[in-house]
């Protein structure tokens, strides 16, 4: 499994060659490209969009325009589509149903793939229960999008869920359908249990860990120069190594 280290600090791209996962929103105020050392992937920033606005504020063309500009930084492997998350509090924000979120997710991918870009845009399965995800799979199928033939398919609405058993059942189901899944923000305990069934996953948990525990990396432990290491690449890399060795 490829593990992408989540980060909200753009210059981390120029300081490490480990695979990174970065939100499109972090690039919004950046006007020039970076000299990335390694490969990385782009999150759509959809959770923040829906949480803040109850809808997407970017059209498909605007999103692709931003993805194309971001792609001037080397190493971008893929970008997630503009999906519609299905956690209950997101559904409450939009006032729509899970089924409508799924329809909009499928329609978004269809529109994005008609636009001009060299970046691979990956589809995202959305839902909350296993039956929801099955329904989303069928929606893609009915629109002639065969998820089994896709190089990678995102599994959405899992990163803020604590019930690892539910997510494991969902991952197992689609793994047995030979779908190459990317788990967005999968919990560390989840990766231990079903990581081998994922093609890739990402996590920004190191930053929250540093902020709330107030632990420092080896570089800052003896002589802390910051309140915490929530933005510290050294802390992130040490956390990543610890997780990899568990």
Task: Label each residue range with its predicted role.
Residues 68-201:
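Eukaryote-skewed repeat-based solenoidal scaffolds used as protein-protein interaction platforms
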Residues 1-15, 45, 68, 80, ...:
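Alpha/beta catalytic cores of nucleotide-metabolism and tRNA/nucleoside-modifying enzymes
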Residues 1-108:
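Non-catalytic, usually N-terminal nucleic-acid engagement modules in DNA/RNA processing proteins
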Residues 23, 32-33, 44, 129, ...:
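Generic serine detector
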